[in-house]
């Protein structure tokens, strides 16, 4: 029905397109082209809070990276952390349905559009799906596919701007967390894949393939891959400043107004770095570089009383 050459030109999960979408990432990549953020940063994030990780990217102008209007499969406090595999879907129409199934067939893909994505997952992945908020007949995940996610990703899961089903079965799958919009018993129907590992959207957040997904509580943060190292180090600074600040307030050394300032004075930084070097609680922060903070303390606006975010 459709021109063979046209079908061959259309690609899903296209390595070169993914590389072009993520030019700021300079490190290793997966075979599909997604940025391969080192596992050590994902591991460090498990001990960090949402606000600690959100702050560094927000200050850089990435203000559309969080969505909180979601439900969680498990409410036991488990976090969802991994590398995004993105997919975008639209309501079905017969001609587009035929085209996209022909594209999938030409690439050797089996099953339905949601299965195509699950079949590509590797360890540490999180599937991030825009189902255009479709819940009735929009149940992207159920018991079988959640089991497949566990098998392929080990500790991954999903973020679905749409529905799920078989919740009782899904909850029996260990080490998986899923964020979703609603539950419905209907199987998935009447949808078409628009894009696979391209730009997608989860509510108010924009997501690229390879972004780091950080789900905590009822919300999800999508961290650009090229900022992860800086974000983790910035979050560590926020964490140790909080630990030090709480103690200084309790001891009456500084006021809350002083601790909450965006820019600390040299005296405060001297006390902080000394505390890091001498207190056992500061041991894991001893490799952090505070030169930028000292530069702001010396050359910033002394009248700037803006509080930290």
Where are these regions (language model features)?
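Short, solvent-exposed loop/turn segments at the edges of secondary structure
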Residues: 195, 215-216
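Feature captures the catalytic cores and cofactor-binding loops of soluble hydro-lyases/lyases
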Residues: 43-209, 222-271, 276-309
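Buried hydrophobic positions in well-ordered alpha/beta secondary-structure cores of metabolic enzymes
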Residues: 33, 149, 211-213
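Basic/polar N-terminal segments that are highly enriched at the extreme N-terminus
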Residues: 1-19, 299-309
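Short acidic, Pro/Gly- and aromatic-enriched capping/linker segments at domain boundaries
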Residues: 9-29, 40-42
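Short, isolated positions in well-ordered beta-strands
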Residues: 36-37, 207
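Structural motif
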Residues: 34, 218-220
């Amino acid at each position: 029905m459709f021109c063979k050459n046209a079908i061959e030109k259309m690609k899903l999960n296209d390595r070169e397109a993914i590389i072009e979408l993520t030019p700021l990432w300079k490190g290793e990549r997966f075979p599909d082209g997604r940025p391969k953020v080192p596992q050590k940063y994902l591991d460090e994030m498990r001990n960090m809070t949402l606000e600690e990780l959100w702050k560094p990217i927000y200050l850089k102008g990435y203000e559309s990276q969080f969505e909180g209007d979601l439900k969680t499969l498990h409410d036991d406090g488990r976090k969802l952390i991994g590398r995004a595999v993105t997919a975008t879907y639209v309501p079905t129409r017969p001609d587009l349905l035929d085209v996209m199934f022909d594209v999938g067939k030409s690439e050797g893909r089996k099953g339905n559009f949601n299965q195509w994505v699950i079949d590509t997952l590797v360890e540490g992945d999180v599937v991030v799906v825009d189902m255009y908020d479709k819940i009735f007949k929009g149940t992207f995940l159920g018991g079988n596919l959640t089991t497949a996610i566990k098998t392929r990703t080990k500790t991954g899961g999903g973020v679905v701007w749409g529905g799920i089903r078989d919740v009782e079965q899904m909850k029996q799958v260990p080490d998986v967390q899923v964020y979703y919009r609603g539950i419905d018993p209907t199987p998935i129907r009447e949808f078409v894949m628009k894009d696979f590992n391209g730009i997608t959207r989860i509510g108010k957040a924009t997501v690229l393939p390879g972004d780091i997904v950080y789900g905590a509580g009822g919300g999800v943060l999508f961290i650009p891959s090229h900022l992860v190292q800086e974000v983790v180090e910035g979050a560590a600074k926020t964490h140790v400043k909080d630990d030090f600040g709480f103690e200084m307030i309790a001891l009456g050394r500084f006021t809350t107004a002083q601790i909450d300032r965006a820019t600390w004075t040299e005296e405060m930084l001297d006390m902080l770095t000394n505390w890091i070097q001498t207190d056992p609680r500061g041991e894991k922060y001893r490799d952090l570089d505070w030169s930028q903070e000292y530069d702001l303390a010396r050359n910033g606006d002394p009248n700037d009383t803006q509080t930290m975010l």
